[in-house]
Amino acid sequence: MSSGPRVSVAQPRLLFAASGTGGHVFPALAVAEALPEAKIDWLGVPDRLETQLVGDRYPLHTIRVGGFQGSWLLRPLTALRLIGAIFKVRRLLKRQQIEAVFTTGGYIAGPAIAAAWSLGIPVVLHESNALPGKTTRLLSRFCRRVALGFAEAGEYLPGRPLQVVGTPLRSQFYQPSQHGLPIPENVPVLLVMGGSQGAVAINRLVRAAAPAWLAAGLWIVHLTGQQDPDRGQLQHPQYIELSFVDNVAPLLNRADFSISRAGAGSLAELAAAGLPSLLIPYPFAAEDHQTFNARIFAKAGAAILAPQSELTVEQLQQQILDLLRARLGAAIANPLPKMAAAAGKLHVADSAEQVANLLRSLL
């Protein structure tokens, strides 16, 4: 018996507003990948990371917008630019017939949330950090759902419609692949990560401490970032220097330990790999939010928190040697398996799918 004519379901039309650093762009890309049925337009800022990563995947629309630092309302040019950005986004939402907006916070979220709210379009905001950013704290009240990377962020967002989902990782992170580096099979490996922007201070600390680690038998894979002025200064067969890798998962899975900044994206990757770490929060991050992130991992036993202002070359050198002494052959208890298990417990495997389902529920 015929069930009648087939009804075609229109393709959902979404706007993703994510701009700036990998911490904003990569989680949004992960959520976009989890919505293959949707027609996604992307809102960004000229000359930022999204122009390199998004343009060949999704239609990219750009606006010029700054942050909320200082008394911006008292600066007429800033206020006028913000108002202009809101109206530009309103026109985009109408033209593309957008049904819902997803944003990962930051500067771009302000005009996106304001424009969507003014048109009655629902917004899902993802806040990856333990200390929500100023935009999140100010504008989350205008969002239909606020998805959190850390439950602790909810303390700063009373009365908001919250759901803890973790921080989404791109699908390629979970796909088996080889790191392709000439590292012997059983040697201990230290992975140094400075975040998507690199970290000159960490790079210099590591290079100064590295000779003792190399002499002890440690192999080092050092992701320096592309703006490192000292690249190439340390040469050793066990020291591998890379400015950037597109997929860090194979290196995380091969490493025994990591030295890292404490951006939410990097921490999500460390948790997914179950990799113990020494975390050096970026001291100039907005409101020192990386320290809030790092404290959660340290409290869980997954990491050691080492503030940059208090860390000397000698301290870093000795801490790494002490932690890896068992892997370097000493007949002592190995602390790393317990730390690795703690890191793994912080991982949310279906984070991207949870956020995608939040968006689907609004359509």
Curated annotation (Swiss-Prot):
Annotated GO biological process: carbohydrate metabolic process; cell division; cell wall organization; lipid glycosylation; peptidoglycan biosynthetic process; regulation of cell shape
Localisation per UniProt entry: Cell inner membrane
Binding site for UDP-N-acetyl-alpha-D-glucosamine: T21, G22, G23, N129, R170, S196, Q290
First-listed, main subcellular location of the protein, grouped into a coarse class: membrane
Pfam family, one: Glyco_transf_28
Keyword annotations: Cell cycle, Cell division, Cell inner membrane, Cell membrane, Cell shape, Cell wall biogenesis/degradation, Glycosyltransferase, Membrane, Peptidoglycan synthesis, Transferase
GO molecular function, one term: UDP-N-acetyl-D-glucosamine:N-acetylmuramoyl-L-alanyl-D-glutamyl-meso-2,6-diaminopimelyl-D-alanyl-D-alanine-diphosphoundecaprenol 4-beta-N-acetylglucosaminlytransferase activity
Pathway: Cell wall biogenesis; peptidoglycan biosynthesis
Annotated coiled-coil segments of the chain: none
CDD domains: GT28_MurG
Membrane-related topology note: Peripheral membrane protein
UniProt xrefs under InterPro entries: GlcNAc_MurG, Glyco_trans_28_C, GlycoTrans_28_N
Highest taxon of the lineage: Bacteria
Signal peptide range: none
Chemical reaction(s) catalysed: di-trans,octa-cis-undecaprenyl diphospho-N-acetyl-alpha-D-muramoyl-L-alanyl-D-glutamyl-meso-2,6-diaminopimeloyl-D-alanyl-D-alanine + UDP-N-acetyl-alpha-D-glucosamine = di-trans,octa-cis-undecaprenyl diphospho-[N-acetyl-alpha-D-glucosaminyl-(1->4)]-N-acetyl-alpha-D-muramoyl-L-alanyl-D-glutamyl-meso-2,6-diaminopimeloyl-D-alanyl-D-alanine + UDP + H(+)
EC number: 2.4.1.227
GO cellular component: a single term: plasma membrane
Purpose of the protein: Cell wall formation. Catalyzes the transfer of a GlcNAc subunit on undecaprenyl-pyrophosphoryl-MurNAc-pentapeptide (lipid intermediate I) to form undecaprenyl-pyrophosphoryl-MurNAc-(pentapeptide)GlcNAc (lipid intermediate II).
Alphabetized PANTHER family for the sequence: GLYCOSYLTRANSFERASE (PTHR21015:SF22), UDP-N-ACETYLGLUCOSAMINE--N-ACETYLMURAMYL-(PENTAPEPTIDE) PYROPHOSPHORYL-UNDECAPRENOL N-ACETYLGLUCOSAMINE TRANSFERASE 1 (PTHR21015)
Family membership noted in the UniProt record: Belongs to the glycosyltransferase 28 family. MurG subfamily.
Name this protein carries in UniProt: UDP-N-acetylglucosamine--N-acetylmuramyl-(pentapeptide) pyrophosphoryl-undecaprenol N-acetylglucosamine transferase
Gene: murG
